[in-house]
Amino acid sequence: MKTTTSKSSIQNLEEVLKRFLTNKNTFSLCNGEKENLKANLYELLSKLYDNYQLACIDINQIWVYETCYYTFTFESLVTVDRPRENIIADGCIRFMQNFTDGDGIFISFTKLDKNPWVYQLNFRIS
């Protein structure tokens, strides 16, 4: 059973959020808005980590016409079997709903690796 990653999850989350806001975010935000977005994501992703043992390892976002697409990649701190996969998928849907204030439209929740601990959540907001 897989247990932990090498860096602390808080340090990893800080790095992921910084990378997203600096390089991968297509919003035109002032510094205050970026800080609010970072704080909101930090709080929601920390809850996901605490409740489901899912560490966010990457975030991508892109605008296509009037629609914003998000991809969040997670690493589970424990090996995920089928019942647990359903539980963490539910947690990710709750995260999406909280992050988008209920406006997000679910696209997929997918295992990315043959090893059962890397998952990707995809959703959009129109």
Role assignments for model-derived ranges:
Residues S6, K18, E33, D81-P83, ...:
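Short, intrinsically disordered low-complexity segments
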Residues V118-I125:
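Short, low-order "capping/linker" segments at domain edges
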Residues C56-W117:
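Acidic, low-complexity, intrinsically disordered interaction modules
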